[in-house]
């Protein structure tokens, strides 16, 4: 990051931040997309098992990932204020938090997975796939969370193009392992949907090794001597990250949990509905990379300017991100509505699943459009370290609005599984309105204080 003096310079810098982040997010989500696509081609039962397992681990990972995002605005504001001496200590505390979160997730899986699957009453064959898929995924759990600390540190320094290159490399590894292990190619065993778990684990270790090399050898990062001058846990730094990260993690958890809960509600309608629903979720997740990347770039750009006490410039970056988000929302709608048949056929050869995907897409496109407008606002607020209100808005919108509507309508014969999507759509509309109000308030408050 560096100071800019005109709107065009800010736009160019924002695009330079956003573009590599977008490609990075596409690669991260692309691994899941490919896994769902290939597993769907293998069998509907395997897809149902992998989809259920994915919904379960995603629920916990999203919370952990969001919590670890607390490091980003801290480092961005320190760089803006040119106070970098404490950055190495902050990175080490991020490692300690990541390790603790990984241990908690692992213990929950060991003791809670089988009882939960029994409660869901998933088909026995799909249950077996789900359990083995999650066991394979667990091999990459620790590096998956360690990488979040490393990547957030790299991105905070504006080195997003390096993150892009690393994650694209791991994406290639993921695709290769998925294809080889699901179908049994290149001398590897054919293990169906379980291969998707090994694919993720392999990608996680690839990411960790490459990001570790990055912080060891890049000129802007090697001065921090990560892995060389180890720092013990320091509560004041851990507390600062958790004070910012826990509200972020909780707010993202509330949003992500509605997808997992929605997926689990779909289990009661059979494997075909689960497969169709997860296919549409995989498709919407691909488009979610765009607003999410805008949000992440906004956190860095806004946080940098706030750290330098240039509040008007921070507002200009927020306007750039919001206009870009609206343009993306329009493009998402236009593309999806003109390609619904092709998109539906992409995921399955089963006629029943195809028809369900086609109908779910009508809801999914509007969900993606409204989410594209609301998500960047969260990134702007994180740049101001205004994270507690994001927590409350997410709680109200996703659990206070989505969950009851989805549950009630899903149990209504007139709506069934489509009621779940109505609840999802209602939640992002409410969240977008509330985030818009809060962003306007906090920005005008900052300008008033400076004046």
Positions of predicted regions on the chain:
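Short alpha-helical transmembrane segments in multi-pass integral membrane proteins
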Residues: 1-22, 75-142, 188-246, 302-367, ...
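Signature of the first transmembrane helix
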Residues: 12-72, 76, 246-268
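Transmembrane alpha-helix boundary and packing residues in multipass membrane permease domains
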Residues: 21, 25, 33-37, 54, ...
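Residue-level hotspots within pore-lining transmembrane alpha-helices
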Residues: 23, 27, 31, 60-64, ...
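Structural signal for membrane-spanning alpha-helices in multi-pass inner-membrane proteins
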Residues: 36, 109, 178, 182, ...
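Small-residue-rich hydrophobic transmembrane alpha-helices
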Residues: 36, 47-110, 144-163, 263, ...
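Short runs within selected transmembrane alpha-helices of multi-pass transporters and secretion channels
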Residues: 68, 137-155, 163-174, 196-212, ...
């Amino acid at each position: 990051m560096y100071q800019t003096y005109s709107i065009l310079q800010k736009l160019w810098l924002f695009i330079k931040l956003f573009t590599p982040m977008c490609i990075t997010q596409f690669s991260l989500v692309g691994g899941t997309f490919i896994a769902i696509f290939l597993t769907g081609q293998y069998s509907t039962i395997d897809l149902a098992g992998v989809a259920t397992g994915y919904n379960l681990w995603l629920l916990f990972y999203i919370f952990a990932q969001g919590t670890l995002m607390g490091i980003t605005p801290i480092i961005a504001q320190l760089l803006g204020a040119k106070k970098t001496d404490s950055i190495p200590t902050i990175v080490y505390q991020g490692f300690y938090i990541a390790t603790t979160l990984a241990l908690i997730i692992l213990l929950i899986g060991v003791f809670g997975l089988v009882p939960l699957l029994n409660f869901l009453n998933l088909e026995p064959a799909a249950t077996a796939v789900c359990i083995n898929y999650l066991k394979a995924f667990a091999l990459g759990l620790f590096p998956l969370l360690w990488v979040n600390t490393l990547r957030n540190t790299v991105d905070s320094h504006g080195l997003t193009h390096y993150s892009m290159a690393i994650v694209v490399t791991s994406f290639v590894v993921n695709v290769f392992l998925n294809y080889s292990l699901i179908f049994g190619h290149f001398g590897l065993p054919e293990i169906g949907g379980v291969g998707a778990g090994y694919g993720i684990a392999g990608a996680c270790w690839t990411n960790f090794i490459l990001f570790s090399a990055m912080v060891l050898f890049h000129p802007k990062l090697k001065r921090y001597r990560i892995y060389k001058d180890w720092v013990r846990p320091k509560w004041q730094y851990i507390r600062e990250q958790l004070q910012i990260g826990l509200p972020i993690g909780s707010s993202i958890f509330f949003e992500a949990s509605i997808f997992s809960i929605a997926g689990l509600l779909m289990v009661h309608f059979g494997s075909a509905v689960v497969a169709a629903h997860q296919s549409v979720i995989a498709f919407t997740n691909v488009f979610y990379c765009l607003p999410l990347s805008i949000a992440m770039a906004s956190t860095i750009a806004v946080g940098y300017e706030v750290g330098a006490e240039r509040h008007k410039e921070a507002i200009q970056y927020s306007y750039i991100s919001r206009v870009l988000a609206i343009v993306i929302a329009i493009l998402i709608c236009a593309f999806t509505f003109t390609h619904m048949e092709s998109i539906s056929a992409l995921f399955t050869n089963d006629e029943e699943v195809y028809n369900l995907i086609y109908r779910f897409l009508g809801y999914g496109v509007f969900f993606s459009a409204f989410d594209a407008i609301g998500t960047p606002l969260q990134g702007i607020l994180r740049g101001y370290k205004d994270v507690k209100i994001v927590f409350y808005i997410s709680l109200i919108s996703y659990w206070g609005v989505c969950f009851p509507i989805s549950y009630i309508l899903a149990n209504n014969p007139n709506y069934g599984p489509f009621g779940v999507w109505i609840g999802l759509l209602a939640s992002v509309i409410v969240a977008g309105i509330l985030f818009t109000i809060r962003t306007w308030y906090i920005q005008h408050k900052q300008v008033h204080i400076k004046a």
